[in-house]
């Protein structure tokens, strides 16, 4: 299981490691089928219903700690087949409301990515596109997203430029979040099919992405150089639901 701490191991085995009771509860709620559950005996006695989700193995607390990436696991880890990337854009003619896509350019911090994914689910984002950056299936992202990543449609691109080109041809407006100089986000028509681009924590968005987009910003005091990417995303994504 320790090989699943790394992207190479996850790719080779096509498995992800779920750590903790909450993620297993999410599997139960979403009717996902883990392939294996490993838990301590104490955890098994407390959660007999969750143990019915998959083949199970009782291990010592020491062995469980070796399996997990966290220092103090809560007594259980499980294996789940890695969800597949989506293959197409939302159909505009079939959508009940204009689709909203979030495209993330090289977001590196797993905590930020997990928060972005959780916020995307709360805001009703239809798809999340990832152009490099942190692996959405690493344990830190899974925990930070509180399992939201298991419910989202994800697409990983070698470069977001190709995806943005396809979206423009499909009548999506392209919105690029920048620190300053953009249109205030509340002036944007969020009722149009939209792709919101957010960039790397330090470098921001690649120039080839901003060149193809309308610039939008979250106005803030000059004493603060920039907002955390997840904070800015939350404000803009929730604007659509006002």
Residue ranges and their predicted role:
Residues 1-44, 133-134:
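Boundary-proximal intrinsically disordered activation/regulatory segments immediately upstream
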Residues 53-81:
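Glycine/small-residue-rich loop that forms an oxyanion/phosphate-binding "nest" at active or ligand-binding sites
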């Amino acid at each position: 299981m320790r090989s699943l701490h790394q992207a190479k191991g996850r790719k080779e085995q096509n498995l992800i490691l779920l750590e903790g009771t909450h993620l297993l509860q999410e599997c139960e709620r979403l009717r996902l089928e883990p392939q294996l559950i490993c838990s301590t005996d104490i955890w098994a006695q407390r959660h007999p219903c969750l143990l019915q989700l998959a083949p199970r193995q009782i291990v010592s607390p020491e062995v469980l700690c070796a399996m997990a990436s966290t220092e103090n696991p809560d007594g259980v880890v499980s294996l789940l087949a890695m969800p597949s990337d989506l293959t197409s854009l939302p159909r505009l003619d079939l959508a009940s409301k204009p689709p909203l896509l979030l495209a993330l350019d090289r977001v590196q911090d797993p905590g930020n990515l997990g928060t972005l994914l959780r916020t995307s689910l709360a805001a009703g984002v239809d798809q999340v596109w990832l152009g490099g950056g942190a692996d959405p299936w690493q344990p830190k992202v899974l925990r930070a997203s509180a399992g939201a990543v298991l419910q989202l449609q994800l697409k990983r691109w070698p470069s977001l430029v190709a995806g943005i080109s396809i979206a423009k041809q499909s009548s999506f407006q392209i919105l690029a979040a920048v620190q300053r100089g953009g249109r205030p986000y509340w002036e944007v028509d969020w009722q149009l099919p939209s792709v919101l681009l957010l960039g790397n924590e330090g470098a921001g968005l690649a120039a080839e992405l901003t060149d193809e987009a309308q610039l939008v910003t979250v106005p803030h005091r000059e004493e603060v150089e920039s907002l955390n990417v997840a904070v800015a995303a939350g404000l803009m994504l929730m604007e659509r639901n006002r």
